[in-house]
């Protein structure tokens, strides 16, 4: 044996092994496979093609050994992140620290979530279908088992689809597509039509070399396999502290936070701020923002010059400032309707501001328009700016917000005019009596 071989052997022996549960022998899955080959053959096919099968990780490693016949299927355990952590400790630990882990808490915190149809909530046919990847308490998991047929307690399979559980699949941008698309978060559409997405497509078709830079969602949001998946501006592009030396932006951000119910009419924190903290939906310190911004900048500079990358991020921040001014003006117009009695403030609203988190449950057309302005058009402009998609910024975001504000102002004028006419007619009717 050469000295080099000996050195390599010693080095490998000294390397700490990744924590991994001793896998089930593949033969132990034979009984499960024999039955499920007939009842659910594609599940078996996926498992057989998986890395799990190659390593001898069998059905009972994840589902337990209590289910043995067709009459006791309810005894099969449904895996949760702790099941995966038996072998994938670092990845699950990163997930638990990150944004996706708070997805269930975030959707449950919405003030009108309980108004929605059961199938939309716990039935996983609407909001719950994506937000179910978040961690649940024992009580929440029990509730899901009672209302959703026992499903929805898993998390990792949102990206590593069962029963293949492929790392290669989860590394592709399409893995993000199911949840990050559509009305309020069309990141897929933005990415796919951006230069980043286009180059990824061209790389796949071998139109450009295999060595070409072609960032995917994971390149920018899961650097080196980081499962925390955080961004500096968070999901809604709101954060603390307020900008120093910029009174206009500070005033606008205060108004938006009042519309979100995070600040009261005096600008003081409400109980919702604690909910925001618990759900980790926003960066609430400069240090937290700077940490995520530094990670983003480091990623950008792998393909771009540092000066260009910094300027693009700066331009994105500046756009949010301008979007916030339009949004705050819209909120102030609707709040003014409450204040002068033109609109009755809903009894369940804690302050004389429209509650942006009621979303489509907003009670009047003008408040519905404000909801669309916030959750569709502001989101598209903000997200488009950071997904290299100028068309989304302009025509699906900025332009629509300008139109929203014009229509909100016109609606407010019409509501006040109608109220004045009604008062005059009522006074005239009384004078005739």
Residue ranges and their predicted role:
Residues 21, 42-54, 68-124, 133-425, ...:
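Primarily the internal scaffold of c-type cytochrome electron-transfer domains
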Residues 62-65:
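Intrinsically disordered linkers and flanking regulatory tails adjacent to Zn-binding modules
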């Amino acid at each position: 044996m050469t000295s080099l071989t000996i050195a390599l052997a010693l080095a490998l022996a000294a390397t700490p092994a990744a924590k991994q549960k001793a896998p089930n022998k593949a033969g132990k899955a034979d009984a499960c496979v024999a039955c499920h080959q007939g009842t659910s053959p594609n599940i078996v096919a996926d498992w057989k093609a998986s890395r799990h099968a190659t390593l001898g990780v069998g059905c009972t490693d994840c589902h337990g050994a209590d289910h043995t016949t067709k009459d006791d299927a309810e005894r099969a355990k449904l895996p949760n992140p702790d099941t995966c952590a038996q072998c994938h400790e670092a990845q699950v630990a990163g997930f638990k620290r990150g944004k996706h882990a708070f997805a269930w808490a975030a959707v449950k915190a919405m003030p009108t979530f309980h108004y929605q149809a059961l199938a939309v909530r716990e039935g996983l046919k609407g909001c719950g279908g994506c937000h179910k990847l978040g961690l649940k308490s024992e009580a929440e998991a029990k509730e899901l088992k009672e209302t959703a047929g026992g499903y929805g307690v898993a998390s990792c399979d949102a990206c590593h689809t069962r029963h293949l559980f492929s790392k290669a699949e989860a590394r592709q941008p399409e893995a993000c597509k199911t949840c990050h698309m559509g009305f309020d978060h069309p990141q897929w559409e933005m990415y796919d039509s951006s230069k980043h997405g286009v180059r990824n497509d061209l790389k796949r078709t071998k139109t450009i070399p295999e060595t070409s830079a072609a960032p995917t969602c994971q390149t920018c949001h899961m650097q080196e396999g980081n499962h925390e998946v955080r961004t500096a501006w968070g999901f809604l592009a709101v954060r603390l502290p307020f900008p120093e030396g910029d009174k206009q932006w500070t005033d606008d951000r205060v108004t938006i936070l009042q519309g979100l119910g995070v600040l009261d009419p005096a600008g003081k924190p409400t109980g919702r701020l604690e909910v925001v903290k618990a759900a980790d939906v926003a960066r609430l310190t400069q240090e937290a923002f700077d940490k995520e911004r530094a990670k983003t900048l480091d990623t950008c500079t792998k393909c771009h010059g540092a000066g260009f990358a910094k300027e693009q991020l700066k331009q994105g921040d500046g756009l949010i400032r301008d979007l916030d001014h339009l949004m705050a003006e819209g909120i102030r117009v609707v709040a003014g309707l409450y204040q002068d009695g033109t609109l009755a403030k809903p009894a369940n609203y804690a302050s004389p501001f429209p509650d942006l988190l009621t979303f489509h449950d907003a009670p009047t057309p003008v408040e519905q328009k404000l909801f669309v302005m916030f959750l569709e058009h502001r989101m598209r402009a903000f997200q488009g700016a950071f997904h290299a998609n100028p068309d989304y910024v302009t025509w699906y975001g900025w332009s629509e917000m300008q139109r929203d504000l014009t229509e909100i102002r016109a609606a407010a004028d019409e509501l006040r005019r109608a109220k004045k006419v009604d008062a005059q007619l009522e006074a005239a009717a009384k004078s005739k009596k």
